[in-house]
Amino acid sequence: MPGAGLFIFVAAALCEIGGCFAFWAWLRLGKSPLWAVGGVGLLILFAWLLTRVDSAAAGRAFAAYGGIYICASLGWMWAVEGGRPDRWDLIGVLLCAVGSAVILLGPRTA
């Protein structure tokens, strides 16, 4: 799962974050309600992408994805919103990335 799975997780994270941000922009930043239409589309794509990950259990896929989502969220904050992560953000991201790696790469019995 590492190569393609990681790509799918990152794509899913960008879709989820973009979809949620579309609602944030509409409801918190005063953007047009049309932002919500795009947001819904991205959230549907996000959900579909998670079903493409090679995992026997949805819960394991979702748990591993959670760490990727947290990393991507702070990247979004920095790249899109201009907010720079502080040291506590970075420590938290590191812990989440390690947790996701353990879930993704840990040996499994057949």
From Swiss-Prot:
Transmembrane segments: 6-26, 29-49, 61-81, 90-110
Pfam families for this protein: UPF0060
Source organism, top-level taxon: Bacteria
Keywords: Cell inner membrane, Cell membrane, Membrane, Transmembrane, Transmembrane helix
Signal peptide segment: none
Gene Ontology cellular-component terms listed: plasma membrane
InterPro entries named among the record's database cross-references: UPF0060
Membrane-topology descriptor: Multi-pass membrane protein
Keyword check for RNA-binding: no
Presence of keyword Cell membrane: yes
Coiled-coil residue windows: none
Chief place of localization: membrane
Compartment(s) of residence: Cell inner membrane
Family note: Belongs to the UPF0060 family.
Protein name: UPF0060 membrane protein Swit_0423
Species annotation: Rhizorhabdus wittichii (strain DSM 6014 / CCUG 31198 / JCM 15750 / NBRC 105917 / EY 4224 / RW1)
